[in-house]
A protein has these predicted regions:
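Flexible "cap/lid" loop of the alpha/beta hydrolase fold
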Residues: 1-32
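Conserved serine/cysteine hydrolase catalytic core
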Residues: 61-117, 123-126
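Conserved alpha/beta-hydrolase catalytic His-Asp/Glu region
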Residues: 34-73
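Conserved strand-to-helix beginnings and helix N-cap segments that scaffold or border functional pockets
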Residues: 12-15, 108-112, 136-140
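Catalytic active-site module of serine/aspartate enzymes centered on a nucleophile-bearing elbow/loop
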Residues: 120-155
Length: 155
């Protein structure tokens, strides 16, 4: 699980302040999208990567993000209601690698910790200097962790 975001895990575990951060971000994001602002998705990108991340992306990436914003809005609209209890995660029987970026959003850092606590046979790995965009920013380190996990079941 790379930067997995079952947001409801925060809510069902009483991490209300962290859960509220997602609510604040999506309210702004959805409102700007509905108002027709082309760069509304910058709220999501900057939430995960830090202020200014969207603006720092190459134009080609920003254009892609803008083009795919309607699909991302649907993802956010449906994903925020995913609220399975801790017991659901305790049913996962396979060896699970949970990977997070060391510079990630505090809510994402906590979700990774909780997944590791709740899933039996889960291990947490933190990629130094990374955030939510690990496949793009740290592909070699991520591939190394995944290779180890697939080969040995651990990382």
């Amino acid at each position: 699980l790379v930067e997995a975001n079952p947001l409801g895990l925060l809510k069902t575990s009483g991490e209300n302040d962290l859960y509220a951060m997602f609510g604040a971000m999506t309210r702004d994001y959805f409102a700007e999208f509905e108002a027709g602002r082309p760069d509304a998705a910058r709220h999501v990108i900057d939430f995960y990567g830090g202020e200014g991340t969207f603006a720092a992306f190459p134009a080609k990436i920003r254009d892609y993000v803008v083009k795919t914003t309607p699909a991302n809005i649907r993802d956010w609209s449906s994903g925020t209601t995913f609220e399975h209890p801790r017991s659901a995660y305790q049913q996962i029987a396979v060896s699970t690698l949970v990977v997070r970026g060391g510079d990630g959003h505090p809510a994402m850092m906590r979700i990774a910790e909780m997944l590791t606590e709740f899933i039996p046979n889960a291990r947490l790995q933190t990629v130094a200097g990374g955030s939510h965009f690990l496949p793009a920013t740290h592909p070699t380190e991520l591939a190394r962790l995944l290779d180890i996990h697939v080969e040995t079941g651990i990382a």
